[in-house]
């Protein structure tokens, strides 16, 4: 028993050392005020959505993009219907998206789908008209000023930006509530203080932007792990790119609510 207690004590100390700095983060927003934005310039954005059998929700996301306060002529929505067996592609087209369909059971995952979609965009638009790309999951819904707010932070000079990931099903059960609280903590108590301190933030799954310049420097979208968001974050930090955070750009995500889905 003494050995087990000692192991538990050592683990507790290690976790305390690793996470103690986050207690300081709680104070940062009250001590350091956000820097004023630079004058915003208009940029052209491509929205990337990877969807597999998302016919029930894909239309809601595209509609929320079409309702943005940002000029619609500067936003093009692309959907890759990835190994779909339902009407995802048809519904996305009906709501105004440019849709490509992908069928590949050997290379499975969001990273492969995004890589496929970006290659198709290059073929369709060889002149490369887009300044930056935004990535969303098919079950997201955006606040009406989401793109406008992201554009303001992009105009500040950030080449990679993450946003505030909120929940649209917080009250379903304890699992969805737990995920919602985790992502609230990640946005408000990790990325926000890091942004105030001038350090790099972290991309988390959905609701992020990267510039054409970053895509070129990465040699395309070559992030294929199950946690491709973490892989992308680490690649940017290792290569000296600072990831920004836009607290005013809010999206609502349908979070997992069963242990089987996890």
Predicted stretch roles:
Residues 257-262:
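Conserved small/polar residues in nucleotide/adenosyl-binding loops
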Residues 44-46, 76, 231:
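Cell-envelope/extracellular polymer assembly enzymes that use nucleotide-activated donors
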Residues 127-139:
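Short beta-strand-to-loop acidic/aromatic patch adjacent to the donor-nucleotide binding site
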Residues 57-59, 86-93, 145:
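Acidic helix N-cap motif at the loop->helix transition within catalytic regions
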Residues 63-74:
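Short, acidic, metal-binding catalytic loop of nucleotide-sugar glycosyltransferases
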């Amino acid at each position: 028993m003494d050995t087990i207690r000692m192991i538990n004590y050592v683990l507790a100390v290690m976790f305390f050392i690793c996470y103690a700095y986050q207690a300081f983060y709680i104070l940062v927003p009250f001590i350091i005020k956000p820097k004023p934005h630079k004058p915003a310039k208009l940029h052209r954005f491509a929205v990337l959505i990877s969807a597999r059998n998302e016919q029930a929700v894909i239309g809601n996301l595209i509609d929320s993009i079409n309702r943005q306060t940002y000029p619609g002529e500067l936003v093009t929505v692309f959907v890759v219907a990835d190994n779909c067996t339902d009407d995802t592609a048809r519904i996305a087209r009906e709501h105004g998206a440019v849709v490509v369909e992908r069928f590949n059971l050997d290379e499975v995952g969001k990273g492969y789908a995004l890589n496929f979609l970006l290659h198709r965009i290059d073929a369709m638009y060889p002149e490369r008209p887009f300044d930056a790309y935004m990535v969303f999951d098919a079950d997201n819904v955006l606040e009406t000023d989401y793109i406008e707010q992201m554009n303001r932070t992009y105009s500040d000079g950030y080449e990679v930006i993450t946003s505030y990931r909120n929940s649209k099903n917080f009250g379903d059960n304890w699992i969805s509530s737990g995920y919602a609280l985790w992502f609230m903590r990640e946005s408000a108590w990790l990325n926000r203080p890091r942004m105030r301190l001038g350090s790099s933030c972290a991309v988390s799954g959905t609701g992020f932007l990267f510039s054409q310049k970053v895509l070129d420097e990465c040699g395309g979208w070559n992030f294929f792990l199950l946690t491709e968001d973490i892989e992308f974050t680490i690649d940017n930090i290792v290569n000296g790119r600072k990831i920004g955070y836009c607290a005013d750009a809010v999206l609502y995500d349908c979070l997992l609510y069963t242990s089987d889905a996890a």
